[in-house]
UniProtKB/Swiss-Prot annotation:
This is Elongation factor G. It is found in: Cytoplasm. Its main location: cytoplasm. InterPro entries: EFG_II, EFG_III, EFG_III/V, EFG_IV, EFG_V, EFG_V-like, EFTu-like_2, G_TR_CS. Belongs to the TRAFAC class translation factor GTPase superfamily. Classic translation factor GTPase family. EF-G/EF-2 subfamily. GTP binds at residues 17-24, 92-96, 146-149. Keywords: Cytoplasm, Elongation factor, GTP-binding, Nucleotide-binding, Protein biosynthesis. It comes from Cereibacter sphaeroides (strain ATCC 17023 / DSM 158 / JCM 6121 / CCUG 31486 / LMG 2827 / NBRC 12203 / NCIMB 8253 / ATH 2.4.1.) (Rhodobacter sphaeroides).
C-alpha cells in the first residue's frame, strides 16, 4: 500500500501552553473544525475529547499527551479549499509544571508547535519553561494569543512580553478586531482583510471584507513591520523592497515560512477559542508556516554499543531509508492494553514486521498498529516516515527507546530524565492489594520515567518518588481508579542527599585469619568534593602494581556500595571524587572480595573524616499575586527559609521570585489560597541542592537515626 499523503502535506505539531491558557479548548475547536469531533467538549464541564483520563476531566488540567490525527485544507471563506488536504498529527501536551517531563518527551518528536498565551496574563512562568525546552529541541513555532474575550485582554502587551521574556522576535501576522466582549474577529495582515465571525454556528462561518477605515492606519503600520522582518530572509526580496516593491501575498507567505522555520522570528495571531473566533487562521498558519517532516534536518543517531555516542548515522523523512522510530509515550488503554506512541523518522513499518529495540538490544514484533484520535483508534497495516502511530503489544520497550530495522541498527535518542525530588511511602491495605499494587506501580513507571518506585531496605516499605505533590497525587489516584488498588499513603518526604565538605585521605587495611586461606587488602584513598551537580567519579593512580589490576573493580564496587547510604542519615552521597593512590596485597590471601571489603570500610571512615554534610532540594518558586497581598506573601516565604530573589510586575499583578527549600513547601497551595482569597497562583520546580542549616540537619539525623 502506498502512502496516502505526500510528506510535504504532513504536519507534526504540538500545542504548548501554561496551565489555563486554554490549550484543551483550542485543541477541541481544532478537532471540531477539522471534522473529527461532532460536539464541542468544554473543559468547564469536564467533557473534552483530548483529556481522556478521568482525573484530567475532574481537575480540568491536561496530564497526558494524547496524539491525534486529523485533516485540514487551507481556506479563507470556510467553503473553498485553497490547498490540498493536509494531515495533522497533533500532540497535546500538559501545561502544569509537575508534568514538564511530558512536554520534554513530546517536543523531542514534534516538528513544530503552536504556543498559546492567555491574552490577559501573557507569557507566564510555565510558558517560559516550555519555550526554553522548545528552543533546546529547535522546534519552530507560531503563537496564538488566546482568550482575547477576557477582561483585561491586551494583544500588544503579549507581543511585547514575548520579546522581553523569551528573547524571541514576535511577528504579528494578524491583529484582533476589538477585545473583551467587543471581540469581532481578526485582521489578516498578509492579505489585509478582516475575518468577522457571526451567528451561532460555533464559529464555523465568517465574513471576509476589506479593513475598515478606522483600523487601516494601525494595520498598515503592523503590516509594514511584518514585511520588513520577512524580506530580511531573502536578498532578492530585500533588494526589491528597498526599490519600493512590496512582496505579493504568496511571496510574503513564503518569506514568513522561511523566517519561522529558521526561528528568525515567531508569527503571532489572535482570537478566542472559547468564543470560537480566530481558530481557523491558526490552522491555516500551521499549513503555511510550520515545518513538514521534509523541512526538518536529518535526525543523527549513533551505533548501538558506541560508548562515545558519536552521532554519525543519519535518518531522514524518506520511505526508502531503513526503518527507525522513537517510542515517546506509553499509555495503558483499557481495551487494547499497553500502547506505545511512536514517531517514525525513516522507512516503512508493516504489520508483522520484526524490529529491534536498539536501546536495550531486544527484538520486538509489530502486532497491532493504530492511528489515534484522542480515545478512538483506527487500525492500520502500514506506517511511513513522518507518521505518529500507536503500537500495541510491545514487551520490552519503554519511553525514549529506539525501534529500528534489525539489519540497519541505530540509537536515536538518550532521553535524560530529572531526578525525583519528593517521595511518599505506600502500603497496600490487604494481601490482595499487594499483588495489584506491584503490577500497577510497574505499569505507571513504564509510562512515566520521571516517576520511580523503590523499596526501602530497612522498613520494607514501597516508596513512590516523583516531581511534585500534584504528580504523586495523580499517580496515587490512578492506582486507585485504574487498577482498583486500596492503599495507605504516608506523608510526603523530601529526597535529601549527603556530600562532603573537604578532602580526606584514608589508609585502611583489612585482615582476617580464620584457619586456611585468610583475607588481606590494603587501600589508600583520597576523597575530594566536586562542584555541585558533577556527580561521582573514580580513578586509579596505582603505579608499580601495588594493587594488581584485577582487584581494582573490587575497590570501586566497595566505594559504590557506600554511596546509597551516607554516614549522617542514610541518604545517597553525591558530588565527590575518589582516587586510589596506594595499597598492598598478599599473594595468597588477597581477592576481589577482600579489596571490596577494605574500600567499603575505608569509605565509611573517609566520608566522616571529609566532613559529611546534609543537602536538601531547593525549589525555584514564582508567585503571581495582586499588589495588596505582596507583603504578607514575602513574609511567609521568608518564614519558610525562602530567599526572595526579586520582584517584577506583570500586567496589574506582582511577581515574586524566590528559592525555597522543598521541605518547607508542602501544602503551600492551601496557605497561599487563604492568604490571597484564592487570587494568587504559584509555580515551582527543582533548581539545585544546597546545604541544610546545622540545627535542622541535627533534627533530621535524629529522625532517621
Amino acid at each position: 500500500m502506498a502512502r496516502d499523503y505526500p510528506l510535504e502535506l504532513c504536519r507534526n505539531f504540538g500545542i504548548m501552553a501554561h496551565i489555563d491558557a486554554g490549550k484543551t479548548t483550542t485543541t477541541e475547536r481544532i478537532l471540531y473544525y477539522t471534522g473529527k469531533s461532532h460536539k464541542i467538549g468544554e473543559v468547564h464541564d469536564g467533557a473534552a475529547t483530548m483529556d481522556w483520563m478521568e482525573q484530567e476531566q475532574e481537575r480540568g488540567i491536561t496530564i497526558t499527551s494524547a496524539a491525534t490525527t486529523t485533516f485540514w485544507e487551507r481556506t479563507e471563506d470556510g467553503k473553498t479549499p485553497l490547498t490540498p488536504k493536509h494531515r495533522f498529527n497533533i500532540i497535546d501536551t500538559p501545561g502544569h509544571v509537575d508534568f514538564t517531563i511530558e512536554v520534554e518527551r513530546s517536543l523531542a518528536v514534534l516538528d513544530g508547535a503552536v504556543c498559546l498565551l492567555d491574552a490577559n496574563a501573557g507569557v507566564e512562568p510555565q510558558t517560559e519553561t516550555v519555550w526554553r525546552q522548545a528552543d533546546r529541541y529547535k522546534v519552530p513555532r507560531i503563537v496564538f494569543v488566546n482568550k482575547m474575550d477576557k477582561i483585561g485582554a491586551d494583544f500588544f502587551n503579549c507581543v511585547k512580553m514575548i520579546k522581553d521574556r523569551t528573547g524571541a522576535t514576535p511577528a504579528p501576522i494578524a491583529l484582533p478586531i476589538g477585545a473583551e466582549d467587543k471581540l469581532e474577529g481578526i485582521i489578516d495582515l498578509v492579505t489585509m482583510q478582516e475575518w468577522v465571525y457571526q451567528g451561532e454556528d460555533l464559529g464555523a462561518s465568517w465574513i471576509i471584507k476589506d479593513v475598515r477605515d478606522e483600523l487601516k492606519a494601525e494595520a498598515e503600520e503592523w503590516r509594514g513591520k511584518l514585511i520588513e522582518l520577512a524580506v530580511e530572509q531573502d536578498d532578492e526580496a530585500m533588494e526589491a523592497y528597498l526599490e519600493g516593491n512590496e512582496p505579493d501575498v504568496p511571496t510574503l507567505r513564503k518569506l514568513i515560512r522561511k523566517g519561522c522555520l529558521a526561528m528568525a522570528f515567531v508569527p503571532v495571531t489572535a482570537g478566542s477559542a472559547f468564543k470560537n473566533k480566530g481558530v481557523q487562521p491558526v490552522l491555516n498558519s500551521v499549513i503555511d508556516y510550520l515545518p513538514s517532516p521534509l523541512d526538518v534536518p536529518a535526525y543523527m543517531g549513533f551505533a548501538p554499543g558506541d560508548e562515545t555516542e558519536t552521532r554519525n548515522i543519519a535518518r531522514s523523512a524518506d520511505d526508502s531509508q531503513p526503518f527507525a522510530a522513537l517510542a515517546f509515550k506509553i499509555m495503558n488503554d483499557p481495551f487494547v492494553g499497553s500502547l506505545t506512541f511512536t514517531r517514525l523518522y525513516s522507512g516503512v513499518l508493516k504489520k508483522g514486521d520484526q524490529m529491534v529495540n536498539s536501546t536495550k538490544g531486544k527484538r520486538e514484533r509489530v502486532g497491532r498498529m493504530m492511528m489515534m484520535h484522542a480515545i478512538n483508534r483506527e487500525e492500520i497495516d502500514e506506517a511511513f516516515a513522518g507518521d505518529i502511530i500507536a503500537l500495541a503489544g510491545l514487551k520490552e520497550t519503554t519511553t525514549g527507546d529506539t525501534l529500528c530495522d534489525p539489519a540497519n541498527q541505530v540509537v536515536l535518542e538518550t532521553m535524560t530524565f530529572p531526578e525525583p525530588v519528593i517521595e511518599i511511602a505506600v502500603e497496600p491495605k490487604t494481601k490482595a492489594d499487594q499483588e495489584k499494587m506491584g503490577l500497577a506501580l510497574a505499569r505507571l513507571a513504564a509510562e512515566d520515567p520521571s516517576f520511580r518506585v523503590e523499596t526501602d531496605f530497612e522498613s520494607g516499605q514501597t516508596i513512590m518518588k516523583g516531581m511534585g505533590e500534584l504528580h504523586l497525587d495523580i499517580l496515587v489516584d490512578r492506582m486507585k481508579r485504574e487498577f482498583k488498588v486500596e492503599a495507605n499513603i504516608g506523608a510526603p518526604q523530601v529526597a535529601y542527599r549527603e556530600t562532603i565538605s573537604r578532602e580526606a585521605e584514608i589508609d585502611y587495611t583489612h585482615k582476617k585469619q580464620t584457619g586456611g586461606t585468610g583475607q588481606f587488602a590494603r587501600v589508600k584513598l583520597v576523597i575530594t568534593p566536586t562542584e555541585p551537580g558533577e556527580g561521582y567519579s573514580f580513578e586509579s593512580k596505582i603505579v608499580g602494581g601495588a594493587v594488581p589490576k584485577e582487584y581494582i573493580p573490587g575497590v570501586e564496587k566497595g566505594i559504590k556500595s557506600v554511596m546509597d547510604s551516607g554516614p549522617l542519615a542514610g541518604f545517597p552521597v553525591i558530588d565527590f571524587r575518589v582516587a586510589l593512590i596506594d595499597g598492598a596485597f598478599h599473594d595468597v590471601d588477597s581477592s576481589v572480595l577482600a579489596f571490596e571489603i577494605a574500600s567499603r570500610a575505608a569509605m565509611r571512615e573517609g566520608l566522616k573524616k571529609a566532613g559529611a554534610k546534609l543537602l536538601e532540594p531547593i525549589m525555584k518558586v514564582e508567585v503571581v499575586t495582586p499588589e495588596e497581598y505582596t507583603g504578607g506573601i514575602i513574609g511567609d516565604l521568608t518564614s519558610r527559609r525562602g530567599m526572595v530573589q526579586g520582584q517584577d510586575t506583570r500586567g496589574n499583578a506582582n511577581v515574586i521570585n524566590a528559592f525555597v527549600p522543598l521541605a518547607n513547601m508542602f501544602g503551600y497551595i492551601n496557605t497561599l489560597r487563604s492568604m490571597s482569597s484564592g487570587r494568587a497562583v504559584f509555580t515551582m520546580h527543582f533548581d539545585h541542592y544546597d546545604a541544610v542549616p546545622q540545627n535542622i540537619s541535627d533534627e533530621i539525623q535524629k529522625k532517621y537515626a
